[in-house]
Amino acid sequence: MTAPANNTPAAAATDTSVAALHDKILIVDFGSQVTQLIARRVREDGVYCEIVPFQKAEAAFRQMNPKAVILSGGPESVHEEGSPRAPQLIFESGVPVMGICYGQMTMAAQLGGTVEGGHHREFGRADVEVKTNSLLFDGVWQPGEQHQVWMSHGDRITQMPPGFSVAGVSPNAPFAVIQDEARKYYGLMFHPEVVHTPDGAKLIRNFVRNISGLGGDWTMHAFREEEIKKIRAQVGQGKVICGLSGGVDSAVAAVLIHEAIGDQLTCVFVDHGLLRLNEAETVVDLFRHHYNIPLVHVDASKLFLGELAGVTDPEAKRKTIGRLFIDVFEAEAKKIGGADFLAQGTLYPDVIESVSFTGGPSVTIKSHHNVGGLPARMNMKLVEPLRELFKDEVRVLGRELGLPDVFVGRHPFPGPGLAIRCPGEITTDKLDILRKADAIYIDEIRKAGLYDTIWQAFAVLLPVKTVGVMGDGRTYDYVVGLRAVTSTDGMTADFYPFDMKFLGNTATRIINEVKGVNRVVYDVTSKPPGTIEWE
């Protein structure tokens, strides 16, 4: 969620006290689609890092004083006039530098090498032959071995900068890995951050720990303690309102803030009538009775379902739900009165996007349901305790705070809820059918021990009826679609390969136990070309 600049902390991703407390790495973003994966790999090693677009990198470097720098990949060509460059200050500072793909190319060009447009492009899996020992390869690769990596490049180095030597080659990249170990400079033409480079995380760890000498002092326990101090300093004696969606992000934010300021926090849970089976009761019980957090529970289901009657366009559904949520939340906040701050579950990817490489908006695939308009309308300051964390780190923090794993480990659930899992017009009867089918599906997944393996699973009620036979009678009922995907970040996803026995058993249960369904299908579409949700 993004709020107006005058109410948010400074837009630059480096504006945080965490950077001042820990050893850190600066990641200079040249526009790669997988730059966030670099940060996740670094943080997995217990080292704090931040992603900054190349245009802001010099200021960020001066402010952060990082112990090392990683230059990301990117879509540009180094030999083209006006292509992005790393601040020369980085190479003059004496800190270790690792360049990945485009980062390797610009490092080579800036340090006196030659880069040309590649005559032999490499995209996808490739094999790198190790030519010499390297601190980067220590304990991972040995000279003479070949290892699978993931390439995505068009340029290539034709002459190395002074002081560099070749550490690895590939069939189309004679300088696949280059190094200047005296200055601790390393360039990789492949992407170590992606899972398709099996040893990539180990190579990054060698750069972070062994080459850069960072000890890994950034833990979730430390983050918790530091963030509590920050919240107390920011809020003082003020009152905070937090909108609960029933999801993990807002729940973790609320529990952390409550630990910091106690009953100065009031949570507002708007039940729009589009939640999963028994979900509203679970949220109310968790916050009211387990954590004793002041909670206002608003049952606005009749309002939402009334406004959604006859609405079939998915974007219209999302916008209607978002508008009503803001109206209801604002009304409840006025009833509470005296609140100075609004808490939001903003995550680090949202912050990165706001200071993105391009500086402009991405193509809107689907509008996002959030309360981003609330701060401007209500003249409230933001409290965003999760703005330095990725989604997987939020789950770790949730466990650190004692949230039950069955809650913290739940699959992602969209803000518009079941409205976008019920294509076409939404009715109470359709929602009842969908809730029951979804609950059976998730129950079967849990019983099979697959819930934590699957990134996201859910049922969809299709706006289609088909002929069936039950007993001696003809039926004409709805079709339920089942969706399950594996993913690391939700950006790409593959359908989960259930065995046919599981699918058969699940379909049988749904048809036998849910009145109004006579057919079940399984969605085997990956992302791309499809999206995870159907609407």
Swiss-Prot record:
Binding site for ATP: 245-251
Pathway membership: Purine metabolism; GMP biosynthesis; GMP from XMP (L-Gln route): step 1/1
Keywords: ATP-binding, Glutamine amidotransferase, GMP biosynthesis, Ligase, Nucleotide-binding, Purine biosynthesis
Documented EC number(s): 6.3.5.2
Any Pfam family hit: GMP_synt_C
Chain ranges of the GMPS ATP-PPase domain: 218-410
Superkingdom per UniProt: Bacteria
InterPro entries: Class_I_gatase-like, GATASE, GMP_synth_C, GMP_synth_GATase, GMP_synthase, GMPS_ATP_PPase_dom, NAD/GMP_synthase, Rossmann-like_a/b/a_fold
NCBIfam families documented for this protein: guaA_Cterm, guaA_Nterm, PRK00074.1
Assembly, per entry: Homodimer.
Entry protein name: GMP synthase [glutamine-hydrolyzing]
Upper classification of the organism: Bacteria, Pseudomonadati, Pseudomonadota, Alphaproteobacteria, Hyphomicrobiales
